[in-house]
From Swiss-Prot:
GO terms for molecular function: DNA-binding transcription factor activity; RNA binding. Belongs to the HIV-1 REV protein family. GO terms for cellular component: host cell cytoplasm; host cell nucleolus. A motif (Nuclear localization signal and RNA-binding (RRE)) lies at residues 34-50. This is Protein Rev. Asymmetrically arginine dimethylated at one site by host PRMT6. Methylation impairs the RNA-binding activity and export of viral RNA from the nucleus to the cytoplasm. Residues 26-50, 91-116 are annotated as: Disordered. It is found in: Host nucleus, Host nucleolus; Host cytoplasm. The modification Phosphoserine is found at residues 5, 8, 92. One of its GO terms (biological process) is mRNA transport. It holds the Pfam family REV. It comes from Human immunodeficiency virus type 1 group M subtype J (isolate SE9280).
């Protein structure tokens, strides 16, 4: 966790440990008993799991003082994204990384799509 102070690393590890303990404290119910008993156990398990989910969402903001989710990444409109057929697709290098290929004409990758 480069670039951060050790104190926030300790707080992050503490938050992760707390969330892990919460989820481990609610194991999935055993598959024994009548159908109704199994259904009731699963229903109660789901209710506890929902409570754990809501608590674990609040832990990072209270322990670390920041929201749990990162800032959303702004993506270009999907209409402007396409696969570039002119590039060598077999190359595993860094060609085209970070440079979206935008063109006015569509690329024929799959063909016309008509059945014969």
């Amino acid at each position: 966790m480069a670039g951060r102070s050790g104190d926030s690393d300790d707080q992050l590890l503490l938050a992760v440990r707390l969330i892990k303990i919460l989820y481990q404290s609610n194991p999935y119910p055993k598959p024994n008993g009548s159908r109704q008993a199994r259904r009731n156990r699963r229903r109660r398990w789901r209710a506890r799991q929902n409570q754990i989910d809501s608590i674990s969402e609040r832990i990072p903001s209270s322990c670390l003082g920041r929201p749990a989710e990162p800032v959303p990444l702004q993506l270009p409109p999907i209409e402007r994204l396409r696969l570039d057929c002119s590039e060598d697709c077999g190359n595993s290098g860094t060609q085209g990384v970070g440079d979206p290929q935008i063109s006015g004409e569509p690329c024929m990758v799959l063909g016309a799509g008509t059945k014969e």
